[in-house]
Amino acid sequence: MDVILLERVEKLGQIGDVVSVKAGFARNYLLPRKKALRANEANKKVFEANRAQIEADNANRRGNAETEAKALDDKSVTLIRQASNTGQLYGSVSARDIVEALAEDGIKVAKSGVVLGRPIKTIGLHEVKISLHAEVSRTVKVNVARSPEEAELQSQGVDVMAQLFERDEAGFTEDYDPNAEPGEIPTELQDEAPAAEATDEA
């Protein structure tokens, strides 16, 4: 289906562009959200007659979005969630969770403006795009942790999961002499051997 774009649409085009899209995308998204018109002769004439006003309205919305976007500059939110020892969440973080977290800080964004390819399912720092207008967006850091203390460490750049695994591995390290024969006492332990033998003889 051919449509006339009424605003910039990512990966499609700019205001006034006539583009070909799948019928379902046009009917379910572009047309009901007034982002485009069917590209018939009547609509082309209507668009050209109102083009200046359409572009002015878009510029006004873009300006408002730029103002709102200032509150998102270098913005981060923290979400405390239960998770396994491997960092997998018991559940997930959705767009709604991010909207609510921003609202608690006095920042209102539409759920549709949270660009989340898939739900967040692990602890850590995640970058999420917030779209306020077709031409205005910001990136927000979402700090997902199991406790406020863990969130603070992550905000300082600490890889909590990596440190946890390092501690676990350190707990299982043993003294190892690559030159020792099977059954041979390591050199550093030989001083203790006579005492052990004496005890056995006694």
Curated annotation (Swiss-Prot):
Annotated transmembrane regions: none
Feature: compositional bias, Low complexity: 192-202
Pfam annotation, one family: Ribosomal_L9_C
Biological process, per Gene Ontology: translation
Keywords tagged on the record: Ribonucleoprotein, Ribosomal protein, RNA-binding, rRNA-binding
InterPro entries: Ribosomal_bL9, Ribosomal_bL9/RNase_H1_N, Ribosomal_bL9_bac/chp, Ribosomal_bL9_C, Ribosomal_bL9_C_sf, Ribosomal_bL9_N, Ribosomal_bL9_N_sf
Lineage top rank: taxon: Bacteria
Coiled-coil features, chain-numbered ranges: none
Gene designation per UniProt: rplI
Keyword set includes tRNA processing: no
Protein function: Binds to the 23S rRNA.
Protein family membership: Belongs to the bacterial ribosomal protein bL9 family.
Protein name stated in the entry: Large ribosomal subunit protein bL9
GO MF annotation, one: rRNA binding
Annotated region (Disordered), positions in chain: 168-202
Organism, scientific name: Rhizorhabdus wittichii (strain DSM 6014 / CCUG 31198 / JCM 15750 / NBRC 105917 / EY 4224 / RW1)
GO cellular component: ribonucleoprotein complex; ribosome
